[in-house]
Amino acid sequence: MDHSLGWQGNSVPEDGTEAGIKHFLEDSSDDAELSKFVKDFPGSEPYHSAESKTRVARPQILEPRPQSPDLCDDDVEFRGSLWPQPSDSQQYFSAPAPLSPSSRPRSPWGKLDPYDSSEDDKEYVGFATLPNQVHRKSVKKGFDFTLMVAGESGLGKSTLVNSLFLTDLYRDRKLLGAEERIMQTVEITKHAVDIEEKGVRLRLTIVDTPGFGDAVNNTECWKPVAEYIDQQFEQYFRDESGLNRKNIQDNRVHCCLYFISPFGHGLRPLDVEFMKALHQRVNIVPILAKADTLTPPEVDRKKCKIREEIEHFGIKIYQFPDCDSDEDEDFKLQDQALKESIPFAVIGSNTVVEARGRRVRGRLYPWGIVEVENPGHCDFVKLRTMLVRTHMQDLKDVTRETHYENYRAQCIQSMTRLVVKERNRNKLTRESGTDFPIPAVPPGTDPETEKLIREKDEELRRMQEMLHKIQRQMKETH
């Protein structure tokens, strides 16, 4: 028996049977993939070779195993000791270690399986895909943005808007004559257009204010603008408070570009009154129009003067949010450059001219060419970056969280006061014992009118009490 089992301690030469088994393993898809994976894994060669030789040699045992009921037989013990002992490398590498998620081979069905990922299934929940879900839903729904432009005529408001969004919003506009301009009052006009860029849809609404500042007497010419902003807040408040709130259209004004004339030494009284009347209702971004009529030193002095007067009169223009601590340095430098550029000195042009072999949008003068998108000539690129690329969502957030919430709080407070007054009147009516309700005070009355109404209410109450006393006396006498 010892002689028959002596082959187990020696290496088995590679014969035809082993070659056939290897060929069979190579043809089998699952075993071939497993064999190749174990063979390629670092440090697994001794295990692979020993295991392969053992699997090949064991079927060649010809002598039957003794049928002894005693499991502690010496032959059994001797035969068990003749099995090859594991080497040092096999003691530390009894089985391939599990792969990390990053080094795990991807399944060939990974592209078709939405749950297949490089993360470990036991450690990966899936809520990291929430930003992608929000992104898909937002892109599918589209975005709304309402921009108001205000300022006197001739400052390039329409041209700048067309240059910002590369579209013609004033295709059907008619220029008024001199007599019509004299009789013209401040109007509110809306231009809506759908813009799509790389699959993202934007519904842009431009609110224009023709006739603003064109009259000789411009007293309270800003009132129609303020009333329009309040009307949009009121309409949104009604829709939000209604039963069906699925398809609420947001027409609130998110930003107001106020154009300041380059002629003069700062802000005019009309500019101050307009911005003070609207700075609690809308995000105001001051614009220094027609910057090509000023030299670079004049532009710098004009900007400093306007910033000083804005601070002096307590005007609250749109404030850029502070950068987060984890923002990169390039973004922080860009944000600082935008803050220092207020008011933005801009130039608008829809004409394409040729400059140094390039076709650019700009204005051609006898002494040279002014390029609209050249940062050295104007702040058009900075304004577009702020308005469209970096702070459009923040403008909408400030409108919703600050300006609209202020209007909403005022509406709720006024409604609460009216309800309290009505309850007090009903209580007094029940105490007086009359079925005739006391007329309510109309909203918006002055203090003198309210005082007069209260006096009349007291007089009516005394007369009712006298009438009840007379009725009781008449009943007692009868």
Swiss-Prot record:
Residues 1-115, 428-449 are annotated as: Disordered. It is found in: Cytoplasm; Cell projection, Cilium, Flagellum; Cytoplasmic vesicle, Secretory vesicle; Cell projection, Axon. Residues 208-211 are annotated as: G3 motif. One of its GO terms (molecular function) is GTP binding. Disruption phenotype: Knockout mice have a decreased basal prepulse startle response and an enhanced acoustic startle response. Decreased concentration of TH and SLC6A3/DAT in dopaminergic axons and axon terminals, does not affect axon morphology. Male mice are sterile due to immotile and structurally defective sperm. Sperms exhibit defective mitochondrial architecture, bent and nonmotile tails, absence of the annulus (a fibrous ring structure connecting the midpiece and the principal piece of the sperm flagellum), lower ATP consumption, impaired capacitation and defects in the removal of residual cytoplasm. The modification Phosphoserine is found at residues 28-29, 68, 117-118, 325, 432. Residues 447-478 form a coiled coil. Residues 94-108 have a biased composition (Low complexity). Residues 151-158 are annotated as: G1 motif. Expressed in the cerebral cortex, striatum, midbrain, cerebellum and spinal cord (at protein level). Expressed in the substantia nigra pars compacta, ventral tegmental area, projection fiber bundles and in axon terminals surrounding striatal neurons (at protein level). Expressed in hair follicle stem cells (at protein level). Expressed in small intestinal crypts; abundantly expressed at the crypt base (at protein level). Widely expressed in the brain and to a lesser extent in the testis, lung and liver. Septins polymerize into heterooligomeric protein complexes that form filaments, and can associate with cellular membranes, actin filaments and microtubules. GTPase activity is required for filament formation. Interacts with SEPTIN8. Component of a septin core octameric complex consisting of SEPTIN12, SEPTIN7, SEPTIN6 and SEPTIN2 or SEPTIN4 in the order 12-7-6-2-2-6-7-12 or 12-7-6-4-4-6-7-12. Interacts with SEPTIN14 (via C-terminus). Interacts with DYRK1A. Interacts with SLC6A3/DAT and SNCA/alpha-synuclein. Interacts with STX1A; in the striatum. Filament-forming cytoskeletal GTPase. Pro-apoptotic protein involved in LGR5-positive intestinal stem cell and Paneth cell expansion in the intestines, via its interaction with XIAP. May also play a role in the regulation of cell fate in the intestine. Positive regulator of apoptosis involved in hematopoietic stem cell homeostasis; via its interaction with XIAP. Negative regulator of repair and hair follicle regeneration in response to injury, due to inhibition of hair follicle stem cell proliferation, potentially via its interaction with XIAP. This is Septin-4. It comes from Mus musculus.
